[in-house]
Amino acid sequence: MIPLKDDAPRITTPYMTWLLLVTNIGIFLFEWMMRVNYGRGAEDAFVRVFGLVPARVTIFLEGGHVPAHLVTQLGMHVVSAGPALLPFFTSMFLHASWLHVIANMWALWIFGDNVEDHLGHFTYLLMYLLCGLAGGVTHTLLNLASTVPSVGASGAIAGIMGAYFVLYPSARVLTLVPFLFVFFVWLPAWVVLGYWFVVQFLSGAATSISSSNPSGNGVAFWAHVGGFVAGLVMIRLFPSRPRRYRYGI
């Protein structure tokens, strides 16, 4: 199921959602221009430094030494040099492809404005970043030996989706359903988002059970799960913004 738009009304202008959209797209364009001008190797080197590498975090927490229980798992995989903790933040502003950034920004556009309307601009930004952090931590804890840089705003946006699930469960979402034939249908948000979460959880569980490769399979399902759960919890902890109707702010 692919969400296309929702019918939840908002009062305020989603300035922070717009800023996040512009920032993520702008940084991806920087990555793309780096590839065009200097080759794929330059972009890969940039991503290895600023992407989240769980094995690098594990080694950092072990004081710079590879723990014995990871030696066998790592095998011949090389842990790239770079900061260990900074990528928990920087990785959520990087993306792997045009499809990756478009899909993430589309979801943010659909669900972010209403959550921002509820929380206020800066509380919304704080929650976005915390959900991204939660997604990164979850991914790291369940992939301690992974040497593949994880990038993307998916954990943060999953958190916004989790918050939307709590705030607007009955809002209708126009959804593209590619089942035998492609058709469009309005579905309750709790159905669309609940289905998405179950798919991410089952995919993450299946990958964890079946994969013997510490580099992972390229999709950080557990970051999605961790971010979504963080959004479910945090939206209940953060106060809603005072209602201001003048000037649409």
Q: Where do the protein language model's features map onto the residues?
A:
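A detector for small-residue-rich transmembrane helices and their helix-helix packing motifs
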Residues: 1-249
